[in-house]
C-alpha cells in the first residue's frame, strides 16, 4: 500500500511541494506532463466512446428546429455532433452497400422506422441548409457549409433511393394477383355475359351493387391494409423530400402494368383504329372483340376505376392533388384505349348486321359515362365526359345510317321473278326480323334518333321553329325513330305490291299480298315495343288491308266455283234441264281439280292463317256443294252416271280443301270415296 501511495504521489505531486520558478523553468516537468497526458487520454476516450445515433439524431432535430426558428440558415455554425451524425449515417449506408444490402421492407421493422425517420430528418436538413441562403451571394457560404451541404445531399439522395426501392417492392411484389384477377381486385362476380340468364330483379340488384359496392368495401385492390399504410408513409417522405417525380413514376409504371394484365385477362386487344377498319373481320369483332370490350368497359367502370382511385388516394393520402393527377393519368389512358375501339367499330364499313352490336356498345357507354366521369378530378370531368360522349355520338350516328340504309336495301331488291307459291318474300322476312330485333332496342334507338335530330336542328336560325319542334314529339306525333320505321314499312309495302304484279293470276297476287301482310302484322304484334312504334292506327289499317286481300282472293278463286253450284238456269217449266246440270257438275269438278292442283303448292307457313283460310273456304263451298248435290243427285241414274258427274262427296271436298297451301307438289285427286 505504501508503495502504491508513493507511486500515486509521484504521478500527481501536490503543487505546494514544488518550487514555482523551477516549474516555470521546466515546462515539461513530470507534473505538467502527467496532467497533459491525462487530458489527452480523456479526450481520446471520449472520442472513442460511440455516442448513441438516436441521441445524435435528437440533437440534429434540435439543431434543425433552432435553424428554422432563427430563419437565417446561411449563418449557421456546424456543430461537432452534426459531423459525427453524418459519419454514423454514412457508415450505416456503407454497411448496406457492402454487405447483403438493406433488409427488404417489412423484414426488420426497426430498420424501416430508421429509414423513414432519417429520410424525413435529412429532407428537413436539405430544406434548411440549401434553401435558406441567397443564391446570388455565394461568398456568404463558407467552405465548411458547402462541404456539409454536399454530404447531406449525398446521404439524402441515398436514403431516397432506398425508399424508392422499397416503394417499388411494395407496389409490385406485395400485390396479390389471383388466377381470375391479376389486378388483385374484388370483382363482385361481375360478368356481363351471364346477364342473359338473370331475372330483371337480379339485374337491377347487380346494377346497384356495381354503382356503390366498392364505396362500402374496405379492402384495397390486391393490397393488405398494412401494405397500404407502408406505401403511404414512403410516398409521404418521398414527396416531402422532393422526390415526387420518382415516386409517381414507380407508381404509374406498376399500376399501368397491372391494367395491362387486367386487359389481357378480359381479352381486350390493343388495336389501332386503322387496323380495326382495314384488317379485322367483322365476324371476329362481333363474336369476340365487342363482347370483350363491353365487359371490360363495365368492369372498369364498376370495379377497377373506383378501386384504383381508392388505392391512389390511400397511398398518397397526404397529397390529394398528386393522387388525383395519378388516377387521372392512369385511368385516362385506359379510357382512351376503350374509346378508340368504339370509334374504330363505328368507322367500319356499314352493314345491316352491325347495327345491334353498335347499339350494345352505345348502351354500355350510356350506362357508365356519369359513373366514370365523377371519379376524375373536377378539372378533368368535362374533358372525359366530352370524349366519352363523342365516341357515343359516333356509335349513334353509325347506327342511324345503318338503320336508314334499310330503305336502300328495299329499293335495291329488284328481282324480276316471283316467289313460288305466293310465299312470304325473303325481303319481307329480313326486314321484319330486323325490325323485331330493333324493337328490343326501341328506347336506345329513340334516344339515338332524338339526339341526331337535335344536332341537325341546332344549326337552325329560327328559334321559334326550334321551340315548336321541341314540343312536337308528343304521344300522337311519331318520334323521329317511328317516322323512319314508318318510311321503311311504306317502302316495303310498295316493293311487295310491285312483286305481286309479277304473278299472272290475280288470285295468287292477292294471296301473296295477304300472306306477306299477315307475316308483317304478326311480327309487329308480337313485339310490344314495335307495336308502340307503329301505333294502333297503322295496325288497324294493316288489318283492314289483309281483309281486303282475303276477300279479293276468295272472289277470284272460289266465287267461280260457287257459280257452278248456282241453281239458276237448271230448271225449265219445273223440270231439271239435265244437259245443263251435267255441264255444271263437269265444270265444278274441273275447276275444283284445277284449284286443288294449283293451290296445293301455294305456301302458307303461318298455321293460324292456313287454318283460317281453309275454314273460310269450307264455310263457303261445303254447304253450297252439299245443298246442290242433295237437290240434283236424284236427276242422274244410279250407278255409273252418278259417279261420272258427282265426283265428290261433301266430305271429300273438305278433305281436299285441308290439303291446300302446304307447298307440296300436286298429287292427282283420286276417285270418289265411298
Functional labels for PLM-detected ranges:
Residues 1-363, 367, 651-674:
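Eukaryotic N-terminal, low-complexity and coiled-coil-prone scaffolding/targeting segments
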Residues 4-53, 58-66, 498-504, 517-520, ...:
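Extended, charged coiled-coil "stalk/tether" helices of large eukaryotic trafficking and scaffold proteins
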Residues 17, 35, 41-42, 55, ...:
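Context-gated lysine
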Residues 48, 52, 77, 81, ...:
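Short amphipathic alpha-helical molecular recognition features
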Residues 55, 59-62, 81-84, 88, ...:
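Acidic, Ser/Thr-rich intrinsically disordered and amphipathic helical segments
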Residues 64-67, 71, 93, 97-100, ...:
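Helix-turn/linker elements and helix-coil junctions of extended alpha-helical scaffolds
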Residues 146-157, 161, 184-195, 257-266, ...:
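Eukaryote-specific, cytoplasm-facing alpha-helical/coiled-coil scaffolding segments in long proteins
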Residues 276-530, 534, 624-628:
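Extended alpha-helical solenoid scaffold regions that build the rod-like backbones
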Amino acid at each position: 500500500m505504501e508503495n502504491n501511495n508513493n507511486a500515486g504521489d509521484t504521478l500527481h505531486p501536490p503543487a505546494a511541494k514544488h518550487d514555482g520558478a523551477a516549474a516555470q523553468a521546466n515546462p515539461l516537468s513530470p507534473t505538467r506532463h502527467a496532467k497533459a497526458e491525462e487530458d489527452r487520454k480523456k479526450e481520446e476516450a471520449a472520442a472513442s466512446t460511440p455516442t448513441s445515433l438516436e441521441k445524435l439524431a435528437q440533437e440534429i432535430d434540435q439543431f434543425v428546429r433552432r435553424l428554422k426558428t432563427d430563419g437565417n440558415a446561411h449563418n449557421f455554425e456546424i456543430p461537432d455532433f452534426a459531423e459525427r451524425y453524418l459519419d454514423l449515417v454514412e457508415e450505416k449506408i456503407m454497411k448496406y452497400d457492402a454487405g447483403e444490402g438493406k433488409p427488404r421492407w417489412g423484414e426488420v421493422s426497426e430498420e424501416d422506422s430508421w429509414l423513414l425517420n432519417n429520410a424525413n430528418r435529412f429532407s428537413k436538413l436539405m430544406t434548411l441548409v440549401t434553401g435558406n441562403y441567397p443564391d446570388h451571394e455565394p461568398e456568404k457560404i463558407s467552405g465548411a457549409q458547402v462541404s456539409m451541404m454536399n454530404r447531406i445531399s449525398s446521404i439524402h439522395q441515398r436514403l431516397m433511393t432506398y425508399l424508392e426501392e422499397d416503394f417499388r417492392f411494395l407496389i409490385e411484389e406485395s400485390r396479390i394477383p389471383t388466377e381470375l384477377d391479376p389486378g388483385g381486385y374484388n370483382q363482385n362476380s361481375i360478368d356481363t355475359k351471364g346477364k342473359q340468364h338473370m331475372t330483371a330483379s337480379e339485374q337491377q340488384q347487380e346494377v346497384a351493387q356495381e354503382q356503390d359496392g366498392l364505396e362500402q368495401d374496405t379492402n384495397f385492390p390486391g393490397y393488405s391494409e398494412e401494405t397500404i399504410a407502408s406505401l403511404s408513409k414512403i410516398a409521404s417522405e418521398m414527396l416531402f423530400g422532393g422526390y415526387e417525380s420518382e415516386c409517381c413514376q414507380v407508381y404509374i409504371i406498376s399500376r399501368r402494368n397491372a391494367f395491362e394484365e387486367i386487359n389481357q385477362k378480359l381479352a381486350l386487344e390493343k388495336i389501332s383504329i386503322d387496323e380495326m377498319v382495314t384488317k379485322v373481320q367483322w365476324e371476329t369483332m362481333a363474336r369476340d372483340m365487342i363482347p370483350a370490350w363491353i365487359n371490360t368497359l363495365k368492369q372498369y367502370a364498376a370495379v377497377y376505376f373506383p378501386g384504383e382511385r381508392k388505392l391512389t388516394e390511400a397511398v398518397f393520402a397526404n397529397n390529394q392533388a398528386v393522387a388525383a393527377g395519378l388516377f387521372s393519368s392512369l385511368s385516362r389512358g385506359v379510357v382512351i384505349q376503350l374509346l378508340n375501339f368504339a370509334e374504330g367499330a363505328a368507322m367500319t364499313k356499314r352493314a345491316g348486321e352491325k347495327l345491334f352490336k353498335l347499339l350494345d356498345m352505345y348502351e354500355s357507354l350510356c350506362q357508365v359515362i356519369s359513373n366514370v366521369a365523377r371519379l376524375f378530378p373536377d378539372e378533368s370531368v368535362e374533358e372525359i365526359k366530352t370524349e366519352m360522349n363523342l365516341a357515343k355520338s359516333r356509335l349513334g350516328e353509325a347506327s342511324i345510317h345503318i338503320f336508314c340504309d334499310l330503305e336502300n336495301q328495299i329499293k335495291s331488291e329488284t328481282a324480276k321473278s316471283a316467289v313460288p307459291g305466293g310465299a312470304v318474300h325473303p325481303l319481307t322476312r329480313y326486314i321484319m326480323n330486323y325490325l323485331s330485333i330493333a324493337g328490343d332496342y326501341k328506347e336506345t334507338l329513340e334516344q339515338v334518333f332524338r339526339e341526331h335530330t337535335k344536332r341537325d336542328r341546332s344549326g337552325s336560325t329560327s328559334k321559334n321553329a326550334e321551340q315548336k319542334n321541341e314540343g312536337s314529339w308528343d304521344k300522337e306525333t311519331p318520334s323521329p325513330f317511328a317516322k323512319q320505321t314508318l318510311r321503311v314499312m311504306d317502302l316495303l309495302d310498295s316493293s311487295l305490291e310491285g312483286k305481286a304484279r309479277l304473278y299472272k293470276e290475280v288470285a295468287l297476287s292477292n294471296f301473296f299480298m295477304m300472306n306477306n301482310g299477315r307475316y308483317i302484322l304478326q311480327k309487329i304484334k308480337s313485339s310490344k315495343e314495335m307495336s308502340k312504334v307503329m301505333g294502333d292506327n297503322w295496325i288497324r289499317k294493316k288489318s283492314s288491308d289483309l281483309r281486303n286481300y282475303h276477300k279479293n282472293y276468295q272472289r277470284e278463286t272460289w266465287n267461280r266455283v260457287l257459280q257452278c253450284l248456282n241453281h239458276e238456269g237448271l230448271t225449265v217449266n219445273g223440270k231439271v234441264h239435265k244437259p245443263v246440270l251435267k255441264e255444271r257438275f263437269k265444270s265444278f269438278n274441273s275447276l275444283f281439280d284445277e284449284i286443288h292442283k294449283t293451290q296445293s303448292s301455294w305456301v302458307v307457313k303461318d298455321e293460324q292463317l292456313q287454318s283460317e283460310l281453309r275454314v273460310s273456304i269450307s264455310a263457303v263451298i261445303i254447304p253450297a256443294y252439299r245443298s246442290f248435290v242433295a237437290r240434283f243427285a236424284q236427276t242422274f241414274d244410279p250407278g255409273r252416271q252418278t259417279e261420272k258427274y258427282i265426283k265428290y262427296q261433301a266430305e271429300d271436298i273438305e278433305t281436299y280443301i285441308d290439303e291446300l297451301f302446304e307447298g307440296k307438289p300436286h298429287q292427282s285427286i283420286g276417285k270418289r270415296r265411298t
